[in-house]
């Protein structure tokens, strides 16, 4: 028994991930909030994304190492991407840059920014930047609050990947810490083109 406890302590990261997976499995098994109305997310094709180079060249050894350890890959939407939320079609225009789901670097081993949270992350980053979504034909959905943007993120990801527990963890992380990015975008006051 002490051997098992020693191993759990030694490999604590995997112990934590294993416990979270078990909780997530139980939550999905019993259908936590499966009957809840979601945003009805649909799309015709995956977004066409082009990676943007991480600028490590010319930074010197320590600067490049710092960029590699703390930076994250950014992506540019290569062509207009249409999607439906709450029965309305919206578009994220070509040229929009984002970093995938904004997952802390130390968690990238288990959760890729362009993995199961990609679709929600793309729509969410656009909603955070502009505080609205651009309708496919013309106009916008009107102003969105930070909470409404976070709910859209959560619901899109639940509809796409079915991992209720993971998506609620991500949602609550946004509710707790997302105000930093939200307020930063409000200061810049980006406008739709």
Identify the residue ranges that each predicted region occupies.
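Extended terminal accessory/targeting regions
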Residues: 2-193
